Amino acid sequence: QKSEKREKRRQNVKTDQGGKKVMGMKKKMLSATLCAVMVGSLAAPAFTVQAADDTLVYWSMWEATEPQGQVIQEAVDAYTEQTGVKVDLQFKGRTGNREALQPALDGGTQIDIFDEDIDRVNGMYGKYLLDLEDLAKDNDYEATANAGLMAACRDAGGGTLKTIPYQPNVFAFFYNKDLFEQAGITEEPKTWDEFKDVCQKLKDAGITPMTMDDAYATCVIGYHLARLVGEDKVKEIVTEGEWDDPAVLQMAQDIEELASNGYYSEMVGSNVWPAGQNTELALGTAAMYLNGSWLPNEVKEMAGPDFHWGCFAYPALTDGANGIETNNFGAQVFGINKDTKLAKEAFDLITFLTKGEYDQKLADETVGIPADTTNTEWPAMVECAKPVIEQSTNRFTWACGVESNVDMTPVIKENFIKLMAGSITADEFVSTMQDAAK
């Protein structure tokens, strides 16, 4: 009789893929029901109870040990406790995701939810994405979503919403407010002439105006060219070899002027990431650095708690194709597999992660930007980027299209670094690009 009781107890205990014991179906459904009654006191969105044997498979781009992974794990656990929907959360990391996701999707592996950056998901994995227009409408999702990011997702999806953004980011000039104050600078530059004035004031105060690392060199040339002629034309230049376009020489002359005036760090020609951001910007020897809004988090240990961050958009150029309303901004995004049998549950989990409590927690723990517009408290280190995000109505993709020709990217990077370092002239840069494109 005792052995029979033990056997019944054993059958009423199940073990999930993480090795943790969980309640049997009846107990779990009861617990989920109680949780659903209590959700009014929770900040995260509430959902109706689902069957306990529903299992979502979510491949994550994060590592389990990263702050993003830790918050996502906590949110998934809370979602499962609240709804009864089990989630097989697999942390793949960036390399694992990029190497394994495509063949897994091609092979029909059950993956209900996956994530990566907006362009990669909509581009590389686009044919596997579920149309989310109806789900978003039924859940009134966009009422508290960033309109610019949702528009970017639709644009990346060919006019249809196929992904949901989280962890927004923007690529702009980040700077040391204390150094600006020392140089008597009271306003952030909006035009190229104003930007050069800022550089000169910093130099006159004995401060290196800006630095750069090799990893982001293409972002500088991309931004400047795209300001002049727009991203589509930038792509045309690099893919069709149109390096004789007058905009290329204009860009090169603008950068040559910065270099000849001593506005770049003397280390810009030899900096290998993260040397510039860690040893020059973070330590206060250079004032500005063109980078993503993840930068303050990356250098916080070196910069310390007393570093006062500022941020402004890449300046507008005279007679340019666009201005400071157009920026390289984006996000990581969630996609749902078009073949999923749990579309509603998948969208509910994504909503749980991108609204309310866990969206705010993800921003706080990663020193990132909230996706939910009702989460108005941004981490102090990135609050400076809020005006740039809010003024952005048009979007550049990564490096503003200058990396569209993979065969040319290494040549562009190498010679643009030389241009910033002052070791080649604008004319030499143009001729080198023309020769390389032949």
Q: What residues fall within each predicted segment?
A:
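Short, well-ordered beta-strand elements
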Residues: 53-64, 85-90, 113, 162, ...
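Glycine-centered hinge/linker elements that transmit conformational signals in sensory
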Residues: 199-201, 239-269
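Hinge/lid segment of periplasmic solute-binding proteins
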Residues: 118-172, 196, 247, 310-312, ...
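Extracytoplasmic/periplasmic substrate-recognition and gating elements
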Residues: 77, 82, 86, 159, ...
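A structural signal for short loop-to-beta-strand junctions that line the ligand-binding cleft
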Residues: 104, 112, 139-179, 208-209, ...
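Mature extracytoplasmic/periplasmic domains
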Residues: 129-134, 294-300, 317, 332-406
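C-terminal capping/gating helix-and-loop segments adjacent to ligand/active sites or protein-protein/ligand interfaces
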Residues: 156, 165, 328, 365-374, ...
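Extracytoplasmic "Venus flytrap"/periplasmic binding protein-like
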Residues: 78-145, 181-190, 279-280, 285-288, ...
